[in-house]
Regions:
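Extended alpha-helical "rod" scaffolds
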Residues: 1-234
């Protein structure tokens, strides 16, 4: 549909105008509008089932009683933890989408992944806003920050302004549901959290290599001391 809209149809219209010495301005605009609507419908028909699946995965993961375990005696800090299982489920689902799209219509892959990344961030903030999660404890705050940040850094090549803004809003939602002691501890643990994220990026760079083909800098904004924030360090 994309090729038909951007290449085939304009060529046919130009050829018709040339052969018959007529201008089809109004007709061309109507055709473009119809093709744009068809393209959007086809695109949604493909991405919506994936977005719905991602939303269900995120909700079940975050609402699970085992989502954010308290640190054990063997852990060096409360930030010393792994991303939740739902994070890897979502990312592996997107690997499959990437593979399907790349093998059938490679030019559409970035558009599809950007759309699904936006859907992912939307599902995250909706889940964190839920009354089911009325308050956020320190382990939950650390787990949420790690989960969001790891997904954002892994999918940094497909970030958008909208997704980046939602990521920032997620941290505000979490901040509103936690207490001051947890906020202070989060700031103290940011160095450890960055170390964990670096280890995770190195450990999964082969597993999620398909997402790193397009290099872009800057995704979201992980909360930092004095309002300073950063995301997407590689």
């Amino acid at each position: 549909m994309s090729a038909f809209q951007t290449e085939i149809t304009p060529t046919l219209l130009n050829l018709f105008e040339t052969l018959f010495s007529v201008q089809l301005t109004d007709e061309t605009n109507r055709i473009r509008d119809v093709l744009s609507q068809l393209d959007a419908q086809l695109f949604r028909s493909y991405t919506k089932p994936h977005a719905t699946k991602i939303h269900t995965t995120i909700e079940s993961g975050i609402f699970s009683p085992t989502w954010a375990p308290a640190p054990t005696a063997a852990q060096k800090s409360v930030a010393d933890r792994d991303p939740s299982p739902y994070v890897f489920t979502v990312l592996l689902d997107l690997v499959i989408v990437h593979t399907e799209s790349s093998t059938t219509s490679a030019p559409l892959t970035p558009r599809i992944l950007r759309s699904l990344f936006e859907s992912t961030t939307t599902s995250l903030i909706q889940t964190f806003q839920s009354n089911i999660l009325s308050t956020v404890s320190l382990p939950q705050l650390m787990q949420a920050t790690l989960d969001v940040e790891f997904m954002a850094q892994t999918l940094a090549s497909y970030t958008t302004d909208a997704a980046s803004q939602v990521q920032t809003d997620i941290y505000q939602v979490l901040d509103q549901k936690t207490d001051n002691a947890a906020r202070v501890r989060l700031q103290e643990e940011l160095g450890n959290l960055r170390t964990v994220l670096k280890r995770l990026r190195e450990g999964t760079k082969v597993q999620f290599a398909c997402f790193r083909r397009v290099k872009r800098t800057g995704t979201g904004q992980m909360p930092g001391p004095g309002g300073e924030e950063e995301r997407g360090r590689r």
